[in-house]
Amino acid sequence: MTVRVAINGFGRIGRNVVRALYESGRRAEITVVAINELADAAGMAHLLKYDTSHGRFAWEVRQERDQLFVGDDAIRVLHERSLQSLPWRELGVDVVLDCTGVYGSREHGEAHIAAGAKKVLFSHPGSNDLDATVVYGVNQDQLRAEHRIVSNASCTTNCIIPVIKLLDDAYGIESGTVTTIHSAMHDQQVIDAYHPDLRRTRAASQSIIPIDTKLAAGITRFFPQFNDRFEAIAVRVPTINVTAIDLSVTVKKPVKANEVNLLLQKAAQGAFHGIVDYTELPLVSVDFNHDPHSAIVDGTQTRVSGAHLIKTLVWCDNEWGFANRMLDTTLAMATVAFR
């Protein structure tokens, strides 16, 4: 069975989902039947073809009237502001990938369902009353056929949750802190300009900028036992893609740095293959651009202090890795729903 997908919002994640679908060779499993985006279709086609972070798309892209063509595949283009007015029923949409970054409540999900979609997957953290929040590779096996409105969490949650799980299962985490070193994003300014967050009034290319983050809440959503025992801070840095996460945890069992690295390396080669990767090469952030893994552990940066404090550095392409997980979760939702 081929899953019929519609994309709502054709920004960074929406476009990368389409590119990842074609580059990964999964078109027999997923077909994009429609894209809803307020921007004009010519601009959509141009930005799909030419991307500053990920280069030229290898597939031919063209726009004709209300259709976007990728190769010979025709995708209907919509410019609808009202979720209730979207023609998902007419198009036979199985799963809507809502990549707007704006919608994330159950009410918004129900609007897609009312328009005729069978399932909804948000590309960002949603409200607590959604049917499920998935970090693929960790808890997708908990998806049920009755789960209609699902969140794929965030890029940073997808990056750090697998590593936390591995360390907790092996050594028993007592508490932890996370620092996200994230590339600049569209909600920042090119030059100094007004913004409700005064730090985000400043030019993104000229400063390291502290930003509020809800990553600690995202961690405790998956690990309730860590409530009030994990804290997170975030900074944005003057790069356009790839994120690093500095994770520090105190653990119950004594451990050495080489043992931590061996654990994570074996996981990357085994149970978490394709989700977690491991490297000891002297790499920098740009080397992880276009990497499809959720997390890449940098073994050269692992430290252990006093046998119970572990520090690790984990990289991710916050666009490409997450876009690939959107496809994985879509297929997981369809598998349990339509088998």
From Swiss-Prot:
GO terms for molecular function: erythrose-4-phosphate dehydrogenase activity; NAD binding. The keyword Oxidoreductase applies. CDD domains: GAPDH_C_E4PDH (cd23937), GAPDH_N_E4PDH (cd17892). Its EC number is 1.2.1.72. GO terms for cellular component: cytoplasm. NAD(+) binds at R12, I13, R81, N318. The record marks H182 as: Activates thiol group during catalysis. Keywords: Cytoplasm, NAD, Oxidoreductase, Pyridoxine biosynthesis. Pfam families: Gp_dh_C (PF02800), Gp_dh_N (PF00044). Its main location: cytoplasm. It is an enzyme of class 1 (oxidoreductase). Pathway: Cofactor biosynthesis; pyridoxine 5'-phosphate biosynthesis; pyridoxine 5'-phosphate from D-erythrose 4-phosphate: step 1/5. Signal peptide: none annotated. It is found in: Cytoplasm. PROSITE patterns: GAPDH (PS00071). InterPro entries: E4P_DH_bac (IPR006422), GlycerAld/Erythrose_P_DH (IPR020831), GlycerAld_3-P_DH_AS (IPR020830), GlycerAld_3-P_DH_cat (IPR020829), GlycerAld_3-P_DH_NAD(P)-bd (IPR020828), NAD(P)-bd_dom_sf (IPR036291). It catalyses: D-erythrose 4-phosphate + NAD(+) + H2O = 4-phospho-D-erythronate + NADH + 2 H(+). GO terms for biological process: pyridoxal phosphate biosynthetic process; pyridoxine biosynthetic process. The keyword NAD applies. Belongs to the glyceraldehyde-3-phosphate dehydrogenase family. Epd subfamily. Catalyzes the NAD-dependent conversion of D-erythrose 4-phosphate to 4-phosphoerythronate. This is D-erythrose-4-phosphate dehydrogenase. It comes from Shigella dysenteriae serotype 1 (strain Sd197). The lineage of its organism: Bacteria, Pseudomonadati, Pseudomonadota, Gammaproteobacteria, Enterobacterales.
